[in-house]
Amino acid sequence: MITLEVDLGERSYPIHIGTGLLDNAELLRPHVRGQHAVIVTNETVGPLYAARVEAALAALGKTVRTVTLPDGEAFKHWETLNRIFDALLQAGADRKTTLVALGGGVVGDMTGFAAACYMRGVPFIQMPTTLLAQVDSSVGGKTGINHPLGKNMIGAFHQPNAVIADIDTLRTLPARELAAGMAEVIKHGAIADAEYFGWIERNIKPLNACDPDLMALAVQRSCEIKAGVVAQDEREGGLRAILNFGHTFGHAIEAGMGYGAWLHGEAVGCGMVMAADLSHRLGFIDTETRARIRELTQAANLPVVAPELGADRYIELMKVDKKAEAGSIKFILLKQLGEAFITTVPDADLRATLAHAVLKPPTEAPVA
């Protein structure tokens, strides 16, 4: 087992990465201080893993209740969130009740938001079961739900007590979900570590096959990068914004296509290709770097051709973004591979990227 630390002073917490962790009651013991625990999971993950976590908590003498939500980004809204609140209130949960997020990014975001709001804040633990959640969304304390007009526009910063990432859970991931997680792995290399990016390029085939040793290394390095950024800028006042590389375009794709049509990681992957193109148009990265980002994204089985929403629609959607100020869209671009920054861009260059993004090269099969 590997243990990292997210250094936030009194609110610091560990990230445990390894195998067989779902059954490890001793990992949970320091972080479940009250008598009651509520596991929040979904219809896909619950039947696979909930009983194991329930048993670990019961071994600590805790009273355990499990809430099962519908699965998917399309259910990341108020109505589903209220199901968590209903369960907490019906169970008589108090301020020492610990919530346990057992699932992917949607479960983690919603459980964290429920923990932030219930009685103005209760503790929670992240137990991510998807690659995307293990390398990205479970770390850093961002929680929230979607609104029909924008992704993650309603939420709060609420740090978990611990992140417990059991690599074994990745074995049950569908190939599409694994690819979605690889988008965030690639992102971390692109924005912060060119050497790591090269390592991903060299190992993309076994990573796609979910090689356990390589996957553990990828989760570790991605968590190191994200934890380092969060420790410097917890609430996205500056540096942390670089973690949104590909997300401004990606969120527009998700909203424009309807939440759930594209997985979050698929949209981010395509968004990174678009952001790399924009970085190149503005003279920051060379043609080779732009091509490497596109080729690695495609090699990870992610879409590299954007849906044809129309430039005006893309721009409208991107203005509903947490980084936007006074209607001005801000993008995370690359100065070079491994170094990102936030900036506004000329409208003509943005529209050129949007026009280029929907073009399918003659030799490329259409992307679904």
From Swiss-Prot:
Residues bound to Zn(2+): 184, 247, 264
Q: Which residues bind NAD(+)?
A: 71-76, 105-109, 129-130, 142, 151, 169-172
Q: Which domain of life is it from?
A: Bacteria
Q: Which reaction does it catalyse?
A: 7-phospho-2-dehydro-3-deoxy-D-arabino-heptonate = 3-dehydroquinate + phosphate
Keywords recorded for this protein, A-Z: Amino-acid biosynthesis, Aromatic amino acid biosynthesis, Cobalt, Cytoplasm, Lyase, Metal-binding, NAD, Nucleotide-binding, Zinc
Report any one BP term from Gene Ontology: chorismate biosynthetic process
Write down the InterPro entries for this protein, in alphabetical order.
Answer: Dehydroquinate_synthase, DHQ_synth_AroB, DHQ_synth_fam, DHQS/DOIS_N, DHQS_C
Pathway, per record: Metabolic intermediate biosynthesis; chorismate biosynthesis; chorismate from D-erythrose 4-phosphate and phosphoenolpyruvate: step 2/7
- Note accompanying the cofactor annotation: Binds 1 divalent metal cation per subunit. Can use either Co(2+) or Zn(2+).
Task: State a single Gene Ontology molecular function.
Answer: 3-dehydroquinate synthase activity
| Gene Ontology CC entries for this record | cytoplasm
Looking up CDD domains in the UniProt record yields: DHQS
**Cofactor(s) for this protein?**
Co(2+); Zn(2+); NAD(+)
Tell me its EC number(s), please.
Answer: 4.2.3.4
User: Which NCBIfam families does this UniProt record tie to the protein?
Assistant: aroB (TIGR01357)
Question: What family does the database annotate?
Answer: Belongs to the sugar phosphate cyclases superfamily. Dehydroquinate synthase family.
Query: What this chain does, per the record?
Result: Catalyzes the conversion of 3-deoxy-D-arabino-heptulosonate 7-phosphate (DAHP) to dehydroquinate (DHQ).
Name of the protein: 3-dehydroquinate synthase
From the broadest rank down, the organism's phylogenetic lineage runs:
Bacteria, Pseudomonadati, Pseudomonadota, Betaproteobacteria, Burkholderiales
